[in-house]
């Protein structure tokens, strides 16, 4: 089969997420301590998760559901019962600064993206989160020269697996489902969304247990560089 475009998820597909998230939360906690909040790390994590749960519940299915500034804002509100804009900004900025500083592409990602482009394929990043943050990540990772299109869920108002997250980048690149590959680490977002529209789906960096009860991807790979063996 001849492909014309490859769509990649960003977070935990092109770089490892857990280490970045941990660095961000640690920095936010340290900032909270400097601001006078009497939180142990465990207490901070509990407050952060409480704020996160509320945001996820209220904003499910939107890009803002992932916004750490909202998590920090809500955590402070729940803890203090008051509005503290400067503190919420400080914690959110500390989180993202440390997160981005920790980011590093998985081995072989740049070489793989370059090989795909050299073979004439369009490369897109299709990601669930707000645009400013994802632009910051793209810049920090040096991906612009290797990616033809970035689409965030903030741009569509819907999150993967919503069809618009796949149909819009296909329309912009002038390709159809049978010509397009979706590569990601999420069965529910990347694989299910791609499968529903007839894209070829590739699951990477994911545990086998994630597939239980779900339709299978067309291919499974352990790392992004293996993609060239599948597609080229």
Please provide the spans of the model-predicted regions.
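Short, surface-exposed acidic
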Residues: 33-46, 79-92, 146
